């Protein structure tokens, strides 16, 4: 009988591509991971991993086993959910990994809702920017991920996860108060073609989305300054260093000086926010209320955004 715990370790090794990284994700030592993988190979009678440079990759046998492992682990998630429901599991902790703006916009309101609706459900929050939240869910470090997908940089579907769409939000133009277009009620993206731009660093999907929107508008933005921190981007715009596109929710509650924020016309720049859980866990009696509360908070946000 194959030990499911070893299948989780195999999946982590395949995802992270090094034993050291897999061990860190699972809070194990590299030697413990190596021992468990060796035991799994002995159980199956096949070599499952092979060295590839400084990392590891699955063999053909490993690929076959991983496909079945994903299905098996999803079924175990369903079994745990049904057992928890049978036992009347109405109290417990759910760990949610989320990006900062998502915490402020939907997770914090969801926690308030849960405090009234399901006081037995305790939410533990982990700040996870960029792509970090989804691997945390897959590795079992978190139960729910709150993540984003940008236009121009769609995420590949992962059958191990169930995604729950929450809301889409536009990016607004941030201009210095003295910019020639500052008095306009809205700004055509093409009209910013001659401005200096402030944007994220290469590799940030937000930058890919900005570049695509500008390309569709008919120009390549002249990127002069780079920061992945929206507060820094807005501060630079306030200093007259350039213009930027910033998610609307990131601007809410932010202290802005010497800048104006305007809706953009032309090719749309937007991002989609979604929750994700391990397949089979979506109806767990502790996780389902969290997803429902996130959905309620997002519906209110969509109303405000119009």
Identify what each model region corresponds to.
Residues 19, 41-58, 63:
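A short LG(V/I)-centered, amphipathic sequence patch enriched
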Residues 102, 129-142, 148, 201-260:
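Hydrophobic hinge/microswitch elements
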Residues 106, 259-304:
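A late-sequence structural motif
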Residues 148, 181, 185, 195-217, ...:
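Secondary-structure junction motif
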Residues 155-165, 169, 231-280:
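Beta-alpha-beta core module
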Residues 157-171, 175-197:
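Flexible hinge/capping segments at coil-to-helix
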């Amino acid at each position: 009988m194959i030990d499911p715990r070893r299948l989780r370790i195999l999946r982590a090794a395949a995802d992270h591509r090094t034993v050291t990284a897999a061990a860190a994700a699972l809070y194990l030592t590299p030697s413990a991971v190596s021992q468990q993988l060796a035991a799994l190979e002995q159980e199956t009678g096949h070599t499952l991993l092979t060295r590839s440079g400084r990392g590891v990759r699955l063999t053909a046998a490993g690929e076959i086993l991983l496909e079945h492992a994903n299905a098996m682990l999803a079924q175990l998630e369903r079994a745990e959910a049904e057992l928890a429901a049978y036992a009347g599991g109405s109290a417990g902790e759910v760990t949610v990994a989320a990006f900062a703006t998502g915490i402020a916009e939907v997770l914090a309101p969801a926690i308030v809702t849960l405090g009234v609706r399901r006081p037995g459900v305790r939410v533990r929050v982990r700040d996870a920017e960029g792509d970090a939240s989804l691997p945390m869910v897959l590795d079992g470090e978190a139960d729910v991920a709150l993540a984003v997908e940008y236009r121009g940089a769609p995420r590949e579907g992962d059958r191990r996860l169930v995604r729950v769409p929450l809301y889409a939000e536009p990016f607004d133009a941030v201009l210095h108060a003295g910019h020639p277009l500052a008095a306009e009620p809205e700004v055509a993206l093409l009209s910013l073609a001659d401005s200096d731009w402030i944007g994220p660093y290469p590799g940030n999907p937000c930058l890919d989305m900005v570049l695509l929107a500008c390309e569709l508008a008919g120009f390549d933005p002249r990127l002069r300054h780079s920061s992945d921190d929206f507060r820094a981007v807005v501060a630079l715009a306030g200093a007259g260093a350039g213009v930027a596109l910033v998610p609307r929710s990131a601007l809410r509650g932010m202290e802005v000086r010497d800048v104006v924020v305007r809706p953009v016309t032309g090719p749309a720049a937007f991002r989609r926010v979604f929750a994700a859980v391990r397949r089979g866990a979506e109806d767990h009696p502790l996780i389902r209320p969290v997803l429902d509360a996130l959905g309620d908070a997002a519906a209110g946000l969509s109303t405000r955004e119009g």
